[in-house]
Swiss-Prot record:
It comes from Homo sapiens. The lineage of its organism: Eukaryota, Metazoa, Chordata, Craniata, Vertebrata. It comes from the Eukaryota. Gene3D superfamilies: 3.90.1150.170, Type I PLP-dependent aspartate aminotransferase-like (Major domain). The gene is PDXDC1. GO terms for biological process: carboxylic acid metabolic process. GO terms for molecular function: cadherin binding; carboxy-lyase activity; pyridoxal phosphate binding. Pfam families: PDXDC1-like_cen, PDXDC1-like_cen2, Pyridoxal_deC. The modification Phosphoserine is found at S652, S710, S718, S722, S748, S757, S779, S786. This is Pyridoxal-dependent decarboxylase domain-containing protein 1. Residues 28-51, 684-788 are annotated as: Disordered.
Length: 788
């Protein structure tokens, strides 16, 4: 491209193309460096400040732009903020720079150039999309073209609108018909732009019995038109869909065109399926859109072109009305909106344009054919063979549910059962969509909620493939990832009802119905002081659930646990995640209940012990104070004087009554240390009993993870394996009971020889009576001599 720039005679154009290429390359290189860096910190250039007195060069300015673009990224890896644009993208970006440069030409040159650009682009688009004798309006906002078309229809049907204004509309109100499957907010946008009240909008329902549930009901539309005419209203405009915003279904445009011609209604068509008009084979429903009065298209996403305007093609013979409606303009700068698309179309050519749309349609067909072979995947566009949009969802019939159930409640199913099954599948589909978007980001998959079907996954390569560079291998990887996630989805869905029944049958546990959770279920432990009538959070419950989460994570099972909800004002719950294998729900619930109960008991014991210790410390302080006062009375005041006290203690030592004090945590009292010295002298060690371990978990084989169902009843086990399994269990039981037997044997061996020795008995009796032992007297007398 650098060599071709040298051939340009105008040095300004050559310099512009060179600068644009260098700027884009600099931003892309800096983006790659930013992605390679870990933990990028905010630099001083990102902080707003005053305008510098001296100017900066272009490299410094672009560096500042790059810092502003990537300085606030999170630490977690995210999708690139700048799409990987190729040469055709550079041409589209160059169009905006050229537009600013061309606007500086003199008026005559500017008029000729803009007229040529607008006429060329209009002619090319009309021929590509089979729209004969049409005009084009280029606009940045996708809905702006429809608003201009509505103004044109109003001026065409109300001849006195220019003079009388809205008084004409008041006498005969216009009606704009929108499909129930239209994109959200379209009707409100039109009313705001046109200044019409909301009663001027008429929402046409979709089919309910025959045909797609996302297609406009033509018979009902005709009935609405007749009713409006009888009420003195004027049917003005009908917005049809060639590919609805949700699932990509196409209305029966041929029937709608006949109906509009019969009642004099303007027919406007929009939708992603209009791109297939450029292909050699087009379905009859989409081909009928070429005969409509106007249609809006978005070639930018279809071709992967950044900053390319949307296009509205229309047919009208009165230039004055189109000028009043705003579809045409006398300003040359307004005509320059087509410049980026004009450059890009010339760069791609007709073959490149058609090839991109064809590639996107082939990706959709490839995914649709592959998903038909996958179990538990329901495709919502099977009747739309030519649709470039594929919408699917995971769906598995639960035991006891009606196999006819799809989205409409079946009479023999209770509403609660239908809703529970629907919410369960919706949560699982949301989880599946998030997983697929992370595993296959090039697929451009989106998650959406439909009113009838529920949560679904949409694959629309026409809107994403050119930008993300989606290939056939990405579609195959997407199908493989779906198949790998199906066992987890099926296992989780089957365990939900069993988990709920086990929780409801367990005392102290409450099942929480959270439709947005995709895991096995949500459970809450109700402690003794829990206020069941209130949903506000309590600190005790939060501590119990936090300890429960820690204990469960220490088990190293395949399940994931978390504490919720995210709203801090609500009571905390335990969320059990997805199940990748056959989980024993009974053991899981029993473990949760037993662990939570143990944590609560330990917390109660700790609270009681704290209170006992606090009271014991207070009593001990009082006793120590009394002992200090008694010692003062017994020894006298003179012994407390340093010099005098030493002399008195030298000649008349004080006989100590106690060797020390110890604080008993269990009783919360201050005791003497004499028993400890007695036991030390005898050498009698105390054997503590083994700590009892909880028996809430069943015995498992070595290497078997918690919460797994046992395979004792499996026919695949041979006699040898079963015998070895029994021997392993016996060894485990023998090892677990070993310390207790050893302790019992040791205690019996020490206790059988007979009663305690006489010396030990005498010492104990002497201690209990408070009479000092002769040996103690001897040691007390020799104390001062040794000091001397």
């Amino acid at each position: 491209m650098d060599a071709s720039l040298e051939k340009i005679a105008d040095p300004t154009l050559a310099e512009m193309g060179k600068n644009l290429k260098e700027a884009v390359k600099m931003l892309e290189d800096s983006q790659r460096r930013t992605e390679e860096e870990n933990g990028k910190k905010l630099i001083s250039g990102d902080i707003p400040g005053p305008l510098q007195g001296s100017g900066q060069d272009m490299v410094s300015i672009l560096q500042l732009v790059q810092n502003l673009m990537h300085g606030d990224e999170d630490e977690e890896p995210q999708s690139p903020r700048i799409q990987n644009i190729g040469e055709q993208g550079h041409m589209a970006l160059l169009g905006h720079s050229l537009g600013a440069y061309i606007s500086t030409l003199d008026k005559e040159k500017l008029r000729k150039l803009t007229t040529r650009i607008l006429s060329d682009t209009t002619l090319w688009l009309c021929r590509i999309f089979r729209y004969e004798n049409g005009c084009a309006y280029f606009h940045e906002e996708e809905r702006e073209g429809l608003a201009k078309i509505c103004r044109l229809a109003i001026h065409s049907r109300y001849e006195d609108f220019v003079v009388d204004g809205f008084n004409v509309l008041y006498n005969k109100k216009p009606v704009i018909y929108l499909s129930a499957a239209a994109r959200p907010g379209l009707g409100q946008y039109l009313c705001n732009q046109l200044g019409l009240p909301f009663p001027c909008l008429c929402r046409v329902p979709c089919n309910t019995v025959f045909g797609s549930q996302h297609q406009m009901d033509v018979a009902f539309l005709e009935k609405l038109i007749k009713d409006d005419i009888e009420r003195g209203r004027l049917p003005l405009l009908l917005v049809a869909n060639a590919g609805t915003a949700a699932v990509g279904h196409t209305d029966k445009i041929g029937r709608l065109k006949e109906l509009c011609e019969q009642y004099g209604i303007w027919l406007h068509v929009e939708g992603v399926n209009l791109a297939t008009l450029a292909l050699g084979y087009v379905s009859s429903s989409v081909l009928a859109a070429a005969k409509c009065d106007s249609m809006t298209m978005t070639p930018g996403p279809w071709l992967g072109l950044p900053a390319v305007p949307a296009v509205t093609l229309y047919k009208h013979d009165d230039p004055a009305l189109t000028l009043v409606a705003g579809l045409t303009s006398n300003k040359p700068t307004d005509k320059l909106r087509a410049l980026p698309l004009w450059l890009s179309l010339q760069y791609l050519g007709l073959d490149g344009f058609v090839e991109r749309i064809k590639h996107a349609c082939q990706l959709s067909q490839r995914l649709q054919e592959s998903l038909k072979k996958v179990n538990y995947i329901k495709i919502l566009v099977e009747d739309e063979l030519s649709s470039p949009v594929v919408v699917f969802r995971f769906f598995q019939e639960l035991p006891g549910s009606d196999p006819v159930f799809k989205a409409v409640p079946v009479p023999n199913m209770t509403p609660s059962g239908v809703g529970r099954e629907r919410h369960s599948c919706d949560a699982l589909n949301r989880w599946l969509g998030e997983q697929l978007k992370q595993l296959v980001p090039a697929s451009g998959l989106t998650v959406m909620d439909l009113e009838a079907e529920g949560t679904c996954l949409r694959f629309s390569p026409l809107m994403t493939a050119a930008v993300l560079g989606t290939r056939g291998e990405d579609v195959d990887q997407l199908v493989a990832c779906i198949e790998s996630k199906l066992p987890v989805l099926c296992c989780t869905l089957q365990l939900r009802e069993e988990f709920k029944q086990e929780v409801e049958a367990t005392a102290g546990l409450l099942y929480v119905d959270d439709p947005n959770w995709s895991g096995i279920g949500v459970v809450r432990y109700e402690h003794a002081n829990d206020d069941k009538s209130s949903l506000k959070s309590d600190p005790e419950g939060e501590n119990i659930h936090a300890g429960l989460l820690k204990k469960l994570n220490e088990l190293e099972s395949d399940l994931t646990f978390k504490i919720g909800p995210e709203y801090k004002s609500m009571k905390s719950c335990l969320y059990v995640g997805m199940a990748s294998d056959n989980v024993d729900a009974a053991e899981l619930v029993e473990t949760i209940a037993a662990t939570a109960r143990e944590i609560e008991e330990n917390s109660r014991l700790l609270e009681n012990m704290t209170e006992v210790v606090r009271k014991g410390i207070q009593e001990a302080q009082v006793e120590l104070q009394k002992a200090s006062e008694e010692r003062l009375l017994e020894e006298g005041v003179l012994r407390q004087i340093p010099v005098v006290g030493s002399v008195l203690n030298w000649f008349s030592p004080v006989q100590a009554l106690q060797k020390g004090r110890t604080f008993n945590l269990t009783a919360g009292s201050l005791e003497s240390t004499e028993p400890i010295y007695v036991y030390k002298a005898q050498g009698a060690g105390v054997t503590l009993p083994p700590t009892p371990s909880g028996s809430r978990t069943k015995q498992r084989l070595p290497g078997q993870k918690p919460f797994k169902r046992s395979l004792r009843g499996s026919d695949a086990l041979s006699e040898t394996s079963s015998v070895s399994h029994i021997e392993d269990l016996e060894k485990v039981e023998r090892l677990s009971s070993g310390p207790e037997q050893i302790t019992l044997e040791a205690s019996s061996t020490e206790g059988h020889p007979g009663a305690p020795s006489p010396q030990h008995t005498d010492q104990t009796e002497a201690f209990q009576k408070g009479v000092p032992h002769p040996e103690d007297d001897h040691s007390q007398v020799e104390g001062p001599e040794s000091l001397r």
